């Protein structure tokens, strides 16, 4: 319920939700993305028929290619932007040790690999706060360790803040 309130999926009966000194109580969930507030879910969601790299490249919003006039009259701008997004996606797969899977269809990934991909999507927009909902659910011990290491590195090296719901106390500890 708390995550649903913060993420704009539920309306509070009283009080306010404040993020970065801004009242976001009535902000639709799709607008929170641009403010740097992201949420993951217990069951990872991905574009199953796209590769890991393509899934990451889908994340950044307001791309120049989304505007018809740019598509018609500024193809070089779109190509340049796409190259920058691809470079960032490559950095993310490397950071998460998913380079060997960058061309794999996301639908073929294991549950733990999908959770790493989901974490990678938060990296594509430099989230300020990531709400992790049972990030360890259904993940084997090996990938759970990788996931924990990635979360810790994102916090220490890149300044990400995480709020986590998790039942696996060994993972949290």
Where in the sequence are the language-model features?
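Conserved ABC ATPase signature
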Residues: 105-109
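Helical segment within the ABC ATPase nucleotide-binding domain
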Residues: 144-158
């Amino acid at each position: 319920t708390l995550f649903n309130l913060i993420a704009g999926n539920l309306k509070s009966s009283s009080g306010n939700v404040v993020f970065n000194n801004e009242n976001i109580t009535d902000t639709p969930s799709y607008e929170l993305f641009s403010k740097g507030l992201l949420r993951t879910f217990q069951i990872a969601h991905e574009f199953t028929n796209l590769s890991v790299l393509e899934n990451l490249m889908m994340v950044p919003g307001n791309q120049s290619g989304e505007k018809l006039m740019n598509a018609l009259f500024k193809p070089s701008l779109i190509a340049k932007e796409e190259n920058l997004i691809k470079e960032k996606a490559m950095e993310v797969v490397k950071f998460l040790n998913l380079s060997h899977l960058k061309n794999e269809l996301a639908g073929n990934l294991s549950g733990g690999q999908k959770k790493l991909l989901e974490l990678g999507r938060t990296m594509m927009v430099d989230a300020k706060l990531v709400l992790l909902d049972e990030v360890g659910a259904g993940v084997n011990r090996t990938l759970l360790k990788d996931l924990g290491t990635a979360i810790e590195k994102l916090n220490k090296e890149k300044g990400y803040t995480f709020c986590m719901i998790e039942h696996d106390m060994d993972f949290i500890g």
